[in-house]
Amino acid sequence: MRGPSGALWLLLALRTVLGGMEVRWCATSDPEQHKCGNMSEAFREAGIQPSLLCVRGTSADHCVQLIAAQEADAITLDGGAIYEAGKEHGLKPVVGEVYDQEVGTSYYAVAVVRRSSHVTIDTLKGVKSCHTGINRTVGWNVPVGYLVESGRLSVMGCDVLKAVSDYFGGSCVPGAGETSYSESLCRLCRGDSSGEGVCDKSPLERYYDYSGAFRCLAEGAGDVAFVKHSTVLENTDGKTLPSWGQALLSQDFELLCRDGSRADVTEWRQCHLARVPAHAVVVRADTDGGLIFRLLNEGQRLFSHEGSSFQMFSSEAYGQKDLLFKDSTSELVPIATQTYEAWLGHEYLHAMKGLLCDPNRLPPYLRWCVLSTPEIQKCGDMAVAFRRQRLKPEIQCVSAKSPQHCMERIQAEQVDAVTLSGEDIYTAGKTYGLVPAAGEHYAPEDSSNSYYVVAVVRRDSSHAFTLDELRGKRSCHAGFGSPAGWDVPVGALIQRGFIRPKDCDVLTAVSEFFNASCVPVNNPKNYPSSLCALCVGDEQGRNKCVGNSQERYYGYRGAFRCLVENAGDVAFVRHTTVFDNTNGHNSEPWAAELRSEDYELLCPNGARAEVSQFAACNLAQIPPHAVMVRPDTNIFTVYGLLDKAQDLFGDDHNKNGFKMFDSSNYHGQDLLFKDATVRAVPVGEKTTYRGWLGLDYVAALEGMSSQQCSGAAAPAPGAPLLPLLLPALAARLLPPAL
């Protein structure tokens, strides 16, 4: 008699293996343990394999730890817990819950306002807010996390409750009554009809949960309600509860959108704060997600319909809600991309990052890197001033020899933060992996610290040319090493492949690209003569091409004059230069009769534009300075400290004993921050050095420092550019700052 075939042996072996396996489900409470035991028994009686066992944990966090330690295998978690489990313990989501076929494995967190109001997402500070409950996903975690992550809400020392209580002009946050900020966070709550249960995280508080938070808005207690996408439609147009005392119409409410606009309440797919992922079953990275789904799929096939002996998606028999799975679950589905990032999604991940601040992990000090004796003195005074106001974390001052030395010390975890300019931000990010935590903001009219780099030409229809046709033209530059006059335009032309330096000889390459130029310089040694060919010197013809005002074509005004007087065909200047010297703004004889409409800009796309269209037609925007830190530093804590500090010390006329943005008391300039700074600002979505600097500025820097410098052929479009900085060239010829 022949034995079993190979295929049959494999099947028998697989059944033996599965029969010997078990999935240990982690329960977080006695009622959940009870339901888990019943589910295990139901699965066993139905012959579902592998067998299901129940492990008792004390909380979701404890269960995650048990799974990571291989003492349990699976648990269903909400989005916030999935984020922590994935980020801290490497767990992965494998099975998702479905609640509503319209939105599938997710729902949407929205901010609702009355249509008659003028509130937007950018004007929430000071308004009255209605929340479903403390630490609830839609009513608290998403809106608060989003406001923090987007920079609208600053948090000092991880004290989110205080930050929210200071931000809104009163709130109802059911469950916040036991906190230190209950006066503000419970101010709008009213309890039940007899005034009992005020601010309880239960139905005793009339403004609790989704419908309660919306009622808080509808009755005029609050100005904005943070609820889910279906809440308004479930409580208006004839569905309003009689106890509310009024009939509500959905058309009387609108949603706040992330871009500052508003939309109808039916437009929640396009206008929301975040898509909230459904709960999901998580397991260790080495666990077969397909096996878990097959187990649960067999279970839901038998035990998710009415009349079945066990109800997987009901907790009514146990006197609780949402045990093992949410009671609103209609189906369990397999997750294709089993990473916590993919499951949670971009919007929700960003909101969670805004809340990821553990006071117990917050370092007591923020070590600031300083570069000079005056800066040490100012930093010391800043540390004392912050300490007196109990600002956290406290400041410590650590000296370094140079910006690059600061970067090295930050990377080595010897220092935490330093304020850097554009080129140094590039080096800090690309070479040392640092990221921006906060930025400087200057006055809108301050063109010396925040501006666009533009290429200006005469409006000439008969001899018009584009940026791609600059070879052989005559060029006017503010000076060698000036950001708008040299670094950005030359870098942009190199990056686009028009100028190709050989053996790092940028000067010769530029001199051969243009027919003639005026590029004033301090030290003309080994300087190509054509780069001075258009320069005119002073009125007596002396000091030709020197890197100061004795050369009439020096600086941005001088470069424009070079163009005006027909010495050059193109001038590389700031976007304000034309306006500063035309239409009567400059009374000097050469500029007195000039009109701005007689000039145009050359755009990177090959077009020309009016000089007023500089925001859309420029070579790059010079970025503001930024505070740079290690990527593991909580940037919201850094900004939270600076934001609270500038409320006290940011005004140069404040009476609090220290001026953050003024260096005059220390006999220096731009110490710790540029003196022109009006406010420190959050980085928002610009969380990388490339994001902060902007693509055009980075491209210009990479053009100046790329492999093209060594004579390599221009890369194909989209090819990476390798950094090879040119410190020797800059040190040899760099003139004073322009």
From Swiss-Prot:
Segments for region (Antigenic epitope): 20-30
SMART domains: TR_FER (SM00094)
Name of the featured protein: Melanotransferrin
CDD domains xref list: PBP2_transferrin
Positions of glycan attachment: 38, 135, 515
Residues in the signal sequence: 1-19
Phylogenetic classification of the source organism: Eukaryota, Metazoa, Chordata, Craniata, Vertebrata
Database matches in Pfam families: Transferrin
Family: Belongs to the transferrin family.
